[in-house]
Amino acid sequence: NLAPSLNHYVAGLVDAELGDALLNSLKLAATTAVFGTVVVFVGAYLLEKTRGLDWARSLVRLMAMLPMAVPGLVLGLGYIFFFNAPGNPLHFLYQTMPLLVLCTVMHYYTTGHMTLVTALKSIDGEFEAVSASLKVPFYRTLFRVTLPMCLPALLDVSRYFFVAAMTTVSAVVFLYSPDTRLGAVAILNLDEAGDMAAAAAMAVMIAAVSGVATVLYQAAGWWLARKTQAWRKR
């Protein structure tokens, strides 16, 4: 019977408890989008817009590029060995949502870092020099000049983190618990159990959520461009 039907969606959400898995994915994606964007921006800002500790900058840049060279499976296994050690004071984070967020941010850190570094490099460094000469606090320049000029890049990074967190499997597959099972992981579990229909339904729901989120980000970007980026068209 190849007739279109919603039976597999209903059965998956109710019988296979895919609703909880999808909700966990949304929590992970939303938290990663906010926390990841903040962390990446702070790291990029400290590298590009501050002075001092020149000896450490090359090391920090290397560490920022390193996640791109580490496979997700290796990253997930590393987190298991580190956080699962009983003597580790951070052991309480194991199999919790904060650890999934941390792992996802680190997994996709490099792309966001490169995007924001490029955006910050495009801003004339004289802004900071003039602010310092006029004794204007750096945070005022940050909030009045730097952040507004970086808004499009910040939205792009946030959208990237959201979609990546919705679809990630490789690293988090080792770190979830029954209470933090994600939608993408549920697809693998259903496929292994032979329930292809429910797995396909879950995949469609994840794709739909990612598509809706992308449209919302585009709308937010259009609105913010009208309100804060009109100077670019002058």
Segments (PLM) and residue ranges:
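Interhelical loop and adjacent transmembrane-helix boundary motif
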Residues: N1-L18, M166-W223
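Membrane-interfacial helix termini and adjacent extracytoplasmic/periplasmic loops
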Residues: A3, A11, G19, R51-V60, ...
